[in-house]
Amino acid sequence: RQFPRTESHAFRDESKQSLFNLTKIYQQIDYNDTLIMGQHMTQGSFSWHNGVKDTRVIWTPDKRGRFFVTWLPENALQNNVIIKNGKKYPGNEHIGSFGCDSYDISGVVVGKGSNGALSGMTKFNMDNAPSNEFFLEYIARPQTAEIFFEEVLMACVFFGMPILCENNKPRLLYHFKNRGYRGYSINRPDKTFNKLSKTEKELGGIPNSSEDVKQSHASAIESYIEKHVGLDLVGNYRDSDDMGIMYFQNTLEDWAKFDINNRTKFDASISSGLAIM
């Protein structure tokens, strides 16, 4: 580019074939570049109250934290757990859910392994919460997979929301089940319960190998971008001068580069798409 406005703008490739609407993604990225992010986003970490597992989860703002959030539920909604027949279920399922791109092995010998990613998104709701907005991004590879599993679990408990994971990397799902949180793991949304395999009934989750799932995952992101990202100049979904609300630049840039035939390195796209599904 001859006159780039920002560093990310300088290396932008707008000619390349992208699956998603690049115009909207870049409108949103450029708009976000003008914001003071500290006013919209908090960095921090989750921990169990007094270090005792399976009690309450506490959120602590922390510049070294791996979580970025743009919305926190009010106190009454935090740690909202429902006990049914002695099993734990998320109490804020009507407000939103998580999507997760997990990994199973701790170290990677050659090169850099892909990160684990967690995305949280609200749905349309009448509670004191934003609607159809991403509110949490976590893209990290802590030293061990166990730390990652525990951090994901704490986020789910704190927000009281269920999570959709890929079940071809089942360790995270076993972590949930063994700790009594099977009720937090969403069953694959594209099949009825009696059509699920034995493992899917046991753990929840969705396979990422089938073409159908890849397609519906990509079209979930595509339609989210059309409705909620950048400017809607035609005014199909909102006023034409209303900028979308999507503060997570990492996820936006991941969407811009996303390649459906080589999904492995796009952690944020995988997790955000699962959250939308």
Where are these regions (language model features)?
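Short alpha-helix plus adjacent loop in nuclease-associated cores
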Residues: 185-234
